[in-house]
């Protein structure tokens, strides 16, 4: 039997307005080579100037994962040649990163596990190579975008643990609001280092790096395939020939990894301190940066203070947008448990395809009005579902307008309800006698008949209250 050893390197693009060493915009989707200047094009004489906001965001991350923040950190030149790297070196941090020795906790199959974070360092992103119609093009809009590279300890033991770690990391980054962490746009990318060893062995065997995985599903599939490939090679006696230190790409069509190139060692990059950048020396005020409430803290508060079930709280902290939506709801002085039900079950049940909580046709204010109308007895919970579906499709219609249009307003007028109840009791004198002799289940019959006569418009609470008075 084998033990899997996985370490992950995550590159997340920091959401600064400008690049890390120049004033070019970092906006995504611009025309190729428009967000560029002499610095990110590496023209002679152009000098880098460090973006203070990128430093603050790195510190915020360090605090969120209980890491050590180095008061002194150094930028190095990482030398290699590639078309999308104009300088032929990348400015990164090597010996002294800004963040070291952090941790986060994951839960897999009911078990909590601590995963160490070796380091998190600042660096610049490269440009983008585009290969089409027998031509290769280079777009340098992305060159110089600030990255935070987060390196885990090799303490993950399965693809499930790897995905749990990444989801937790992704959530922390989003709640800190230091990156949009959009995997489709490449602002949260993962490289996985995978190796195997016999159970009980502590030696680290040959590791394979799988590059640029940009979805949780593909990360899981890539790791599972690579573990299978290495395990089969070991069992076949071809491990030393088949498993070499290399970089592999994941084929998302066939769900296999393919060799890309040999894996470089650190010495091959010839790191040395960048002579154009002074060491970063942090004042104490930088270390006192306040960070927002993190997912685990928010979850605990929802459970302890609002009495929400753990499973529901998990859904509410599944994204920053989801938790913001919920908190906007409860800020309207509504019953938290009612809010959970209408958000997690009813509204989320309508969101399909490309619709998410971020672009929901029904915002928190509108859903809040609907919940208020349930609480004040204007409509029943059953009718509210029809109202929600209606305003979901007809976004310009307000809740009260929809209630009127659909004719779903409840009747709470005592005299109107009493008149109907009197008719039903007079028409069913025998059943009234049976009820009074001890057949309590007949109460449901009277409620049903009353609601039927009222065509579902009577307030159920009022119906129950009046019936109890009438029947004694």
UniProtKB/Swiss-Prot annotation:
Domain of life the protein comes from: Bacteria
Enzyme class at the top of the EC tree: ligase
InterPro entries: Asn/Gln-tRNA_amidoTrfase_suB/E, Asn/Gln-tRNA_Trfase_suB/E_cat, Asn/Gln_amidotransferase, Asn/Gln_tRNA_amidoTrase-B-like, GatB, GatB_C_1, GatB_Yqey_C_2, Gln-tRNA_amidoTrfase_suB_CS
Keyword ATP-binding: yes
Catalytic reaction(s) noted: L-glutamyl-tRNA(Gln) + L-glutamine + ATP + H2O = L-glutaminyl-tRNA(Gln) + L-glutamate + ADP + phosphate + H(+); L-aspartyl-tRNA(Asn) + L-glutamine + ATP + H2O = L-asparaginyl-tRNA(Asn) + L-glutamate + ADP + phosphate + 2 H(+)
Gene3D superfamilies named among the record's database cross-references: 1.10.10.410, GatB domain, N-terminal subdomain
Alphabetized GO MF terms: asparaginyl-tRNA synthase (glutamine-hydrolyzing) activity; ATP binding; glutaminyl-tRNA synthase (glutamine-hydrolyzing) activity
One of the GO BP terms on file: glutaminyl-tRNAGln biosynthesis via transamidation
Documented EC number(s): 6.3.5.-
Xref: Pfam families: GatB_N, GatB_Yqey
Keywords for this protein: ATP-binding, Ligase, Nucleotide-binding, Protein biosynthesis
PANTHER family found in the cross-reference section: GLUTAMYL-TRNA GLN AMIDOTRANSFERASE SUBUNIT B MITOCHONDRIAL AND PROKARYOTIC PET112-RELATED, GLUTAMYL-TRNA(GLN) AMIDOTRANSFERASE SUBUNIT B, MITOCHONDRIAL
Function: Allows the formation of correctly charged Asn-tRNA(Asn) or Gln-tRNA(Gln) through the transamidation of misacylated Asp-tRNA(Asn) or Glu-tRNA(Gln) in organisms which lack either or both of asparaginyl-tRNA or glutaminyl-tRNA synthetases. The reaction takes place in the presence of glutamine and ATP through an activated phospho-Asp-tRNA(Asn) or phospho-Glu-tRNA(Gln).
Subunit structure, as described in the record: Heterotrimer of A, B and C subunits.
Family listed: Belongs to the GatB/GatE family. GatB subfamily.
Designated name of the protein: Aspartyl/glutamyl-tRNA(Asn/Gln) amidotransferase subunit B
Species of origin: Campylobacter jejuni subsp. jejuni serotype O:23/36 (strain 81-176)
Gene label: gatB
